[in-house]
Amino acid sequence: MRVLNFVLTTTVVLLTSSEGIASSPQVRHIKPNVAIDHLSIRSLRATENPGSDESRLNEKDTGFDPDGSSSKEDEDIGEPTFWEKVRFRYWKTMGKTPGDLRKEYFEGMDEAVIKNNPNYKLVQQYEVYYDEKSSE
């Protein structure tokens, strides 16, 4: 009797859920008509100032600080996401320092390769988080 109830319940669920599936003519109407070309996407800055020359350095912001750090790199770090903040809190609780993360992620790598690594930004964000929480 239980097997029969299971089979009937499964059949009812499958039949009712099959009506929610889009048929092929419906799918054609849902698809966008515009093909996205990733190479043709322009940045907002270029579209706002079409006549500006982006290759020139702005005299006010050269991206270099006298103490040797780059302000451009600090600006590009951005805000960590919620999950990155959770990860940072876990690392801080476990006693990991930014030096430990650099060693874990980038040991034996060239500096040019490190800056192109997706984890480079994460480690920089953790350094900022670590400094803020250590000073409290």
Curated annotation (Swiss-Prot):
Identify the domain of life: Eukaryota
**What are the UniProt keywords, alphabetically?**
Host cytoplasm, Host nucleus, Secreted, Signal, Virulence
The segments labelled Disordered in the record are 42-78
Which stretch is the leader sequence? 1-22
- Comp. bias intervals (Basic and acidic residues): 53-63
Q: Main localization of the protein?
A: secreted
* Induction (record text): Expression is up-regulated at the earlier infection stages.
This protein's GO cellular component annotations are:
extracellular region; host cell cytoplasm; host cell nucleus
Q: Where in the cell is it found?
A: Secreted; Host cytoplasm; Host nucleus
Motif RxLR-dEER, residue range(s) on this chain: 42-56
Q: Is Chloroplast there in the keyword field?
A: no
Family membership noted in the UniProt record:
Belongs to the RxLR effector family.
Note on domains (UniProt): The RxLR-dEER motif acts to carry the protein into the host cell cytoplasm through binding to cell surface phosphatidylinositol-3-phosphate.
Function of the molecule: Effector that acts as a broad suppressor of cell death to interrupt plant immunity. Inhibits cell death induced by cell death-inducing proteins, including the PAMP elicitor INF1 from P.infestans.
Q: What is this protein called?
A: Secreted RxLR effector protein 10
